[in-house]
Amino acid sequence: MPSKKQTLARWLCAAGLDRLGLRVQGLLGPSFVRALNYHDVPPERAQDFERQLAFYAERFDCYGVSDLRALYAGRPKSSRPGLILTFDDGLRSHADVVAPLLEQFGWTGWFMVPVAFVDTPPEEQVDFAAAHSIGHKNHVYDDARIALSWDDVRALSGKHVVGCHTWNHTRLADSLDAAALEEEIPRAKRRLEAELNQPVDVFAWVGGEEAAYSAQAARVIDDAGFDLSFMTNNAVIRPGDHPLQIQRTNVEAWDSEAVVRFQLSGLLDLGYRAKRRRVNRLTETR
């Protein structure tokens, strides 16, 4: 049975509101970019994800780090809208399924890695995922590993973007003390940089709930030296936006084309406006 989101998306797309939303977004400026966040892309969903990539490639430019920085400086890649595709949680499918398909289309992925998940012995990774709110499908592999390996992370960094997604996949709530924030943010950044032998300038907050954001975590992210930081509060990216408050919109590999169109339409941005403004005020550092 279709979910409520699928049914709503189908109705809105049938009414043409998805196309109207894209046109309205385009009228607000010469170019705009939307960041999407994915999680697990299991092998049985590879064809679905490939269809989504084909849909994106027909309509959007792919944005990497240099493209995004140029946009912030007022130099969009082209007159077409852009997309940033991010993949959270350091899952094995990101190397096995996602990266080869992205490369087939000539697209760049942004992979957000929680350090401790990669460090966890394979036989303990399912338990770690359950204890730290990392969702995954029931993959059938020849071994117990469900996380990226460090070799995977290094390989991804060669053609894609690797960002920090905390140490333990922890929501950076107001309840965390200074020691916990040190572990989750600067320590995780240093470890990724040591493994990759290159700077890691990109961060992604864990969780989209309002309580998952805090002023002190925002200051630590800024002080640690990150210059791009992703949240999940639904808004397009435009020149002049705060680079440590980049909003994302959730899409998953199993979402129908109607759901994808709905998520891209900007209609959800309106519903998230009040929350987004509260979170942005809370996490303003510059």
Where do the protein language model's features map onto the residues?
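A short, Lys/Arg-enriched amphipathic alpha-helix followed by its capping loop at the start of a domain
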Residues: 52-59, 101-105, 159
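Short, conserved acidic/polar surface loops in the N-terminal third of protein domains
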Residues: 75, 95-98, 121-125
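C-terminal active-site subregion of NodB/CE4 polysaccharide deacetylases
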Residues: 1-86, 92, 175-286
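Metal-dependent polysaccharide deacetylase catalytic core of the NodB/CE4 family, i.e.
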Residues: 36-39, 80-83, 103-211, 246
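Short acidic, Gly/Ser-rich segments with clustered Asp/Glu that frequently serve as metal-coordination loops
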Residues: 89-96, 101
